Amino acid sequence: MFDGALRDHPWPVAQWTVVLVAALVAALNDLHSRRIPNLLTLPLFATGVTQAYLAAGKAGLFDSLIGCAVAGLPYVLLFLFAGGGAGDAKLMGALGAWLGLAHSLALLLCVNVAGIVFGLLYARRHGRLREVLTSISGTIWTTTASVLGGGGISQALRQPPSPPLESPLKMPYGVAIFLGALLATGSLLL
């Protein structure tokens, strides 16, 4: 997928090792307490930015901050508008600070894929798969009909949302972040 980007470069291997260990700690904590603590995410962010600056100066610092924004911003938006966890957003931002722009894009893609698969398996395990799929298909149908019907995206945004689930199904997304980080690391090693 990424043409063996890590095989011959020791520094990215060290960065991905930090990312995997931090994501594993976050996943285990999320499974146990349904929280990803600031005690993990804030030092992770600070050390990510610091190592980038020490390794490459201002350019490294800029790359680290852009990586933080690319990996973290989608999860900040999910936190603000869709009930995602703040810890998930902070963890993704901190991981992005360690990885910089290029590898944050790989991480984001792989975490999203892992999140979809893990989310569907989690819903199935809790007997809610049909309900979740119905909600997702209703949202897709309403949005597609609004856009194709000439109303455009602004019309789609004004549509009433799909009927809510009986009660929100909260999954420990730290697990999906760890699985996505594993997937991204594996794809970079191939």
Please tell me what each predicted stretch does.
Residues 1-190:
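A membrane-topology feature that recognizes alpha-helical transmembrane segments
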